């Protein structure tokens, strides 16, 4: 039997930002029994002993008091370290470029947090993500958020039927300017707060400095695939495929880009030109596949795919290799497909699921120089 809103408990994850603040406000206005939870996933005390999470939690407290909902802080630092940060370091160690946001959603926000919320008697969890959940054809579907510029289904691609059945995304039908306006009209403390960018546990810190605290940097040679030495790199983990900035190669002609890595010999491969052929692939093997639907997939189907966040949709053919692996054939060659990153599949507005990019090919030949 469906419960009325006032009988339905929704536990919302609140970050201290404007999105989750407005999501909580909307749920409260819709009559739900709302509880705000601040997740502390990382000990981010800086060298002066200042913890930025404390400021964010203070904003959560202020907003919850303004809205009139109870709030708690929950510590998930151990789970985050074990499930997200360890993976993050392992991927960099392997010369790949990880996507911690995907793992955080899968393991923390929609697993550890969901379990905690259910223990609090929650019927649903909610977050400030730009995405939508719909129940159609006997199952839950995840749809892109209405705001194309903010859609976050790319990062939510590993969510299951079970997780979606317990999830609400109050902002899915709204656009960012509307959300700012709502926060302003309601006088919320976070109305003018700047959006956070980058990886949550690094924050405003320098990426190189942060990473070197956990992984020793191993400087090495920077050269073309034909062996022409162009300089030295600071450590392979600091570079991603297609990167231009930070190479420090002068001279005339087209700009230089990172085109590959040789982990064994600690070489960073570089070459000139944004549209350099070395940066393009047309076939991908991806692993750690997760589908939103439990329905059996055809062994081969056409859809679109994003190989990185905010990329345009690319037409592809997906071939199921086994339950953990897919082969992706691209209609057109795609630039800078990066091992370790997520590839996410779509059918129109519906997010079908995703996987981790493992191997890249061009014209049937594996691009070994990608690492």
From Swiss-Prot:
EC class name: transferase
Chain positions recorded as ATP binding sites: 13-20, 39, 128
The keyword Ion transport is assigned to this record: no
GO molecular function: ATP binding; tRNA binding; tRNA-uridine 2-sulfurtransferase activity
Compartments, record wording: Cytoplasm
Family: Belongs to the MnmA/TRMU family.
HAMAP family: tRNA_thiouridyl_MnmA
NCBIfam families reported in the protein's UniProt record: PRK00143.1 (NF001138), trmU (TIGR00420)
Protein name: tRNA-specific 2-thiouridylase MnmA
